[in-house]
Amino acid sequence: MSRRRRTTGWLAAVSALAFGASLVAATSASAAGTFNIRDYGATGNGSSNDSAAIQKAVDAASAAGGGTVRVPSGTYKSANTIHLKSNVTFQLDSGSTITGASGTGYDAAESNSNDQYQDFGHSHFHDAMFYGDRLTGIGFTGPGTIDGGGHLITGNPGSGEADKILSLTRCSGLTLNGVQLRRGGHFAILTNNCDNITSDGLRIDTASDRDGWNVISASNVTVTNADISANDDALVFKSDYALGAKLPNGHVTVTGSHLQAKCCNALMFGSETCGDFSDYNFQDITITGAQKSGLGLVSMDGANISDVHYRDITLTGVRSPIMEKIGTRKRCGNSPGVGHISNVTYDDITATGASPSFSPTLWGQSGGNRISGVTFTNVHITVPGGNGTMSTSVPSDNGDYNPNSLGTRPAYGWYLHNADDVTFTDSSVDFAADDGRPAVIANAGRNLTFTGFTVERGSKSPYDLGFQSVTGYCVTNAKTTTGAAAKVNSSSSTASCGTTPPPSTVTVTAEAESGTVTSPMQVQADPAASGGHYVTVAPGNNSKSSAPSGGSTVIPFTVGAAGTYRLWGRVIAPTNDDDSFWVRVDNGAWTDWNDIATASTWHWASVTDDSDSDAPVLPDLAAGAHTITFAYREDGARLDRVEITNDLTLVPTD
């Protein structure tokens, strides 16, 4: 009995010592701000499930007010979802790998009442190796690896299966530096409604699985020195309805990166395009393969996409080097209309296409939903060629967003349809194999200019540049690769060289809540609003005699052509005492927009000037970037959406 007591006492002493050592280690780690997962029980042997230890380290760092979770060299199997916490960064040391596992230990996909607006993978976020919602100050730094290990699902996962490595929603302040992600299932990274994202030296290799990084509804993003190889889309910018709202996107820069997409798109906008996109800059990028689009930009669900700029980009082995398309899918929960694409520039681009059918294409819709304001400077594209002559009629459109949604283009080089204000300067297109089609065909456009444009002429091509129903085209100093003057053919078109071209129709729309909203103006939810939200002032705030010094929404917008514009707002003015705003364009004088037609439902109203007998406000705008500001005047007035158009007879509709 006494021996057993002594043994028990010895064990108790050892336990006390171990506990004390653990406490000292934990206290030391906390003090240093670094939490080593091995101190919390991780084995790193590649076979034991280290998820619990990793989670303990995360929780300890969070309890300490934030810190770094260190992953030392070793292979750490993680068979359960790790729940991220604010102000916690993972540091993966050289030689460290966190690997996924088979089985059903991951969090099940949550329910989502908005499933019908995007596919399963985009609609669910919990079913991931790492998940977080409404977090701030989180990150992953390398040079270690997170590897799904071939265990993550590329289709729709069953309960307990994961289909992504990193899944984040409604986060702010994400850092991804130097870490490598491999075999990510459907997504290596899925972020939705996150802002202030920075990434340097991120490496993704998910060519055996599906997507690299889906950046959805994001603002203020900087990506440098990324290397992303994917099977589906490599780096893609989207805006869906998975979070139950139409959300803005913008202020994005990607530089010094390499992208590859084995089956699909390398650098892509869409197809999910509910919210508007503005201010994107891509520079010094190499793309080495894309079986769909190299540079793809589509608006399928009502998005207005503007101010997108590509510079110093080299593409090889891409089926469609450049593709812009406006579609009419309208798969978004806010009953969207048809979108716009405007103010897009391509500078110093060299591309080699890999499909004779998917010629570089700009495809807009008729009416006010055309592509506009696109410039190409020093853009040189080589396509496979190899087609014979064919009809020059408009190809079929199956309504999809991919390059193969359109039939074989009647031009081997550029095909433009419903595109206005497009300019090519010092650019060229040629083929690898003789082709009987013209180099360029433009159909139903305005103000198309080709200056210093070089084409290769096929032996059976009837002409080099063709214009069909184009109002205002100009071709100067265009030649073939042999030095001969380029042949131009036109039908139902007018040349505009040396004349002032007719104005193009420009219509820009934007959500009121997409601007910079300052107190006491506030964003409120309403499912009947076009984006699910609107802007109004907090009750009790009125400023009838003059515009307030604060309390407004400042909405940026860009117009592709100079001219006189009319302003519209989608509003609710419940009574005659709640029917006004202060409005100004850029830093101009304030206008008292009063006497808005009263109604308890959303409706469009022209912005008018109360001091000028309620005449419509018609500012003269230069082409380029502007702002429109709405400040409060009477509480109760609500603003959902704005529209700026140079079609002075246009009346917006829902």
What function would you assign to each model-found segment?
Residues S2-R3, F630:
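Short alpha-helical segments used as structural interaction elements across diverse proteins
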Residues R3-L11, L17, L23, S28-P501:
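Extracellular/periplasmic carbohydrate-active domains that bind, remodel
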Residues W10-A12, A21, N36, S47, ...:
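Generic hydrophobic-segment detector
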Residues F19, R38, K56, R70, ...:
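Surface-exposed charge patches in extracellular/virion surface proteins
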Residues P501-D654:
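Extracytoplasmic
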